[in-house]
Amino acid sequence: MSAPNRQLVPIPGPSALPIVGNTFDLDLDASIQSLVNMFEEYGPVFQLTIAGHKQIFVGNVQLTNEVCDESRFCKIVFSGLELLRSAVHDGLFTAHEGERNWDIAHRILMPVFGPTKIRGMFDQMNDIAQQLCLKWGRYGPTFPIEVTEDFTRLTLDTIALCAMGYRFNSFYRDNMHPFVDRMNRFLKDTNTQSGLPDLFNSLWLHAKKRNKEDIKAMREFSQEVVDQRRQNPVDADDLLNALLHQTDPKTGEGLSDSSIIDNMITFLVAGHETTSGLLSFAFYYMLKNPWAMEKAQQEVDNVIGTERVTVNHLSKLEYLNAILRETLRLMPTAPAFTVGALKDDVIGGKYAVKKGEPINPILQAVHCDKEVYGPDATEWKPERMLEEGFHKLPANSWKPFGNGKRGCIGRAFAWQEALLVVAVLLQSFTFTEDDPSYQLRIREALTIKPDGFKIRATLREHKTTAGMVPESVQSLRQAQKSGKPGNSKSSANESMVGQGNGRSVSIFYGSNSGSCESLANLLASDCAKYGFSVQTTDALDAARENFTSNQIVLIVASTYDGKPADNATEFVNWLKSLTGEPLKGVSYAVFGCGHHDWATTFYKIPILIDELLEQRGAQRVAPRGAANAAVSDLFSDLEKWEESILWPALGLTPALLESQGDTQPRLTISFQRPYTQRKEFLEATVTSASELTTSASPSRKCHMELQLPQDMTYNTGDYLAVLPLNPLSNVQRALSRFHLAWDSVLVIEATGPTQLPTATPISVADLFGAYVELSQPATPRNIRALAGAASDEPTKQALLKLAEDDFATQVRDKRLSVLDLLGQYESVALPVEAFIEMLLPLRPRTYSISSAPQWNPSHASITWSIIDTVSWSGHGRFLGVASNHLYDLSPGAVVRVSVRRSNPAFHPPQDPNSYPIIMIASGSGLAPFRGFIQERALQQKAGMTLAPALLFFGCRGRDDDLHRAEMDDFEKSGVVRVMRAYSKAPNEPDAFGCAYIQERVWSERKEFRELWNRGATVFVCGGTKMSEAIKDVFIKIAYGNAGQDDNKSSRDWFASLDPHRYVAEVFN
């Protein structure tokens, strides 16, 4: 806002001294408390000069609300955050406004932190929480527990397991993991340096050296986690797989290797530091206010009792929610954020601020604004944060998770984790202070935590340490149950169009997290089931060209920080720009998703779309539906809205819904002779198979040679897509349950969209084995369908209870599939058509080809890692579909494959004498270069002259030196020269003292530079750490500036290289 008619006044504050500014006005060990105290002297706004830069601090709700206006202010990275960039560069937390990598990473990672995905992480969170309970239970009632340290262990292990599938096992260590020690020291140093003048920092050489060591250690650890995932891939829908494999839905770009590491460290730090502080402060306040502890424990007893805590319990713990909110009000563990004006501006009607000048809301002061929270604002009273009071708070009066689009992306993750931990601890223990005279001391880095706070924990009467083995672990000991034969007769039902009468429906969604997209796909399937003709299911931004008067438009949308999803922004802007009634004749309905903790923007965008469509002439055919992710399941809410509101509004009668319900399949099946499977995949024959690693190796790798089908060709460096089969044990369970023989043949006809093979005879074993997922957890709708097919009332009622009250604990938490439930409830006479319709399609997997096509004509080889781990469902083990299928194949077996082309530049030269090649690989990255070298050997044998070729190969040691005998033969023949590095045995003669491949490249830099100057192409294949290190050493060698005094110009030179001269591919 501007104030042309008001007198501007200077922003108050203490006088700054030359050079040191206001450094001596702050206690560098308690800078936040120093700032909070200054508000008492200077009022709600003051300024300081810190580290040579003027900064403005605000401490009330009115000014905070003003600077949170993203049309006038944006986040700026300054002071401590700017120093953090030395470690994490432009990661999500430290990126400057407008940095491209932030936009890409944010769009890629938003789906990972959607409400459905967070709920799916509950079991892993509970795994770590139970480890904490077991540790405290074994301490006994007199042991002083270092609360902050153990909560740090807990939150670090939780974010690592949930986001990256990595176990720190912190509760089994005497000391913290080295990553934590490095991180804590780096954060403390950074916090101290942020308050010192640049001159002082420039002289603090010891801290600079220590910072570099800490950064190196943190990035190396993160790289190891990435390398482990790449060497042992898992089919997990987690943050690490998103970083490695997902692309930006807007630009199609993926993350660079460096950006992957930046964001991994960001999440490991931010994902546990603030939550551990929250938990520590919460227990401090509860113990200092025993009436609140008693009330919280009573709520846990009433809601959960002695049962295992489930995700559905959490939304019912209203008082625990209030405790966490009130704790973050008084002790916001991320105590401030920084914004800057987009242009010169005025705040508070009288204080001038310059463009980009740092403005810091100090949340401990803002959250104690007596104008909002009353005269007792500094007192801890959870009752003020119960649902009704919390949602009446003014905008931006509670900001512990930051602001707007740069707010905490992991808020829902942290909240679910904190609620779970408090609940299980209160369920298991009674607590006392170790020292009742303890007064709160705060330890500051970039976050705050209690310092020196200790407690004692006594097991409650209903708890024992023996009983603390998590239910999920106990269930892993159960033997896998197999289904028994059920109804052996499958009747083909008549095709029913339904009362949709073929009316056209278009469905659109606005979704960053992926939840609304999933809901839209479910809605499309249901529309087809009831006789509607689904024209499209697409993002809202595609809707402008698809609004016609002869169809029904259904919209599923959510709100992100008060704004539309990224793929709905253009649509909303278009809708706002319309005038008059240009949408007259369009029929529509809107279903909105939200979370009530974002009270000021709850359902904002769905409501806006609903109202604007009506204002512009469209006809609302059904009242808007709504799902609150904080208290319910989105998919169940959509089903309720469909059945109670949407279908009746569209003229579907209860009789039709009953007749075409979930037990009535839309498929017609008849049995005929066997027929060939999917046409895009052809049969290849296994000619040899071997395991490359020993049984002691943590990562089992295999090698397979395949005879390709006729006319299937590939080029050296290409990929092979494999169509896998489900494990035979699961296929047999399904066949047995429906009393079907392996060679039974069926034909599928569908009245709606399906990815199943239709109008084609297919073996039922092929269908169950190669087309559908048999282990996907059942949904409430699936279970209701089973209930409808039950032949006795007790079974029906038991299944209906599973679909409702017991769904989370007995189905979702145990990840029971439809097949599992059919095995448990033998009286369910479900038609095979209905079962097949419930299953999701099975996808192919892709592998690098590690051979040259001419080496063994019509053959190709592949390499892969075997996935065999404990199943989440408790039904035996989880077997990777493709990896175990391939492992089970013997020479002569058939597998269906299809060639996929690689990067056009990632191929050896057709004329081997045209230019030299330099190949650089680590570990399994050797695979494509094995094909390169085979091709050169054949060219040499044909009498062709070979330009020089170098292979730099890094691995652990001689025992890990893949294809060693073969490579020795190639080297003796002059096809290639191999130069090795052994990370675990650098003193071996072959390694020439080099532990890492970049060291070996540098040691051979003279020959490397000579070949480069002769026009060599450099090929790199390996992990991100290796690829980055090779790029750095390559620039030093090829650019000719070993000191890298002009790093920017050398990087510019690298960026301008012919993309065919330096080709790098990350190995997965």
UniProtKB/Swiss-Prot annotation:
| Signal sequence bounds | none
EC number(s) from the headed UniProt entry:
1.14.14.1, 1.14.14.130, 1.6.2.4
Q: Which CDD domains match?
A: bifunctional_CYPOR, CYP120A1
Q: Which Pfam families match?
A: FAD_binding_1 (PF00667), Flavodoxin_1 (PF00258), NAD_binding_1 (PF00175), p450 (PF00067)
Binding site residues for heme = 408
> Cofactor stoichiometry and binding?
Binds 1 FAD. Binds 1 FMN.
- In this protein, which residues make up the domain named Flavodoxin-like? 505-646
> Which GO terms fall under molecular function for this chain's record?
aromatase activity; fatty acid in-chain hydroxylase activity; flavin adenine dinucleotide binding; FMN binding; heme binding; iron ion binding; NADPH-hemoprotein reductase activity
Q: Name one GO cellular component term.
A: cytosol
Could you tell me which residue ranges the FAD-binding FR-type domain spans? Answer: 679-909
Q: Where is this region: Disordered?
A: 464-498
Please list the reactions this protein catalyses: 2 oxidized [cytochrome P450] + NADPH = 2 reduced [cytochrome P450] + NADP(+) + H(+); an organic molecule + reduced [NADPH--hemoprotein reductase] + O2 = an alcohol + oxidized [NADPH--hemoprotein reductase] + H2O + H(+); dodecanoate + reduced [NADPH--hemoprotein reductase] + O2 = 3-hydroxydodecanoate + oxidized [NADPH--hemoprotein reductase] + H2O + H(+); dodecanoate + reduced [NADPH--hemoprotein reductase] + O2 = 7-hydroxydodecanoate + oxidized [NADPH--hemoprotein reductase] + H2O + H(+)
Chain sites annotated for binding FMN: 511-515, 590-622
Question: InterPro entries attached here?
Answer: Bifunctional_P450_P450_red (IPR023206), CysJ-like_FAD-binding (IPR003097), Cyt_P450 (IPR001128), Cyt_P450_CS (IPR017972), Cyt_P450_E_grp-I (IPR002401), Cyt_P450_sf (IPR036396), FAD-bd_FR_type (IPR017927), Flavodoxin/NO_synth (IPR008254)
Which family does the UniProt entry place this protein in? In the N-terminal section; belongs to the cytochrome P450 family.
Report the protein's function.
Self-sufficient cytochrome P450 monooxygenase that catalyzes the regioselective in-chain hydroxylation of alkanes, fatty alcohols, and fatty acids. Preferentially hydroxylates 1-dodecanol at C3 and C4 (positions omega-8 and omega-9). It is very likely that CYP505U2 prefers dodecanol, and probably other fatty alcohols, over fatty acids as substrates. Does not show any significant activity toward tetradecanoic acid.
Q: What is this protein called?
A: Self-sufficient cytochrome P450 monooxygenase CYP505U2
